[in-house]
């Protein structure tokens, strides 16, 4: 009488390992795509939140905060929007329009880079006078009607 061997052959094990490898690769690719879309959605939501705070500031001060040179929002002395404009922190008695500017999501996405006139991964605010402003930012992929690449938010909306 002959005993039958129990277990898997080497070929069967290699096929199963190959299938698991292919499935895990597909899962990682899908996860990275979802992460990029999430970062881009956060960028658009952040810019909308900043523009809302600027409109509240405008209603009280009859103008927008002036920034003759471009400033990176959310860093250094531009982390809060209070009476008098962008500050490192709001003082007692100041009206706070945005207590903490949203931090930019990382890593960088998109085609905007340091050789471009557009910021790669920041919210860049400029306002030559108090009648208008622009916030430039970059998207790595499409979000709604916005395509990948550089965009500008102003009192008239996001283009």
Predicted regions and their residues:
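Short, contiguous, well-ordered secondary-structure segments
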Residues: 1-2, 56
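Aliphatic-rich helix starts adjacent to a transmembrane/signal segment
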Residues: 28-48
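N-terminal single-pass transmembrane signal-anchor helix
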Residues: 2-31, 35
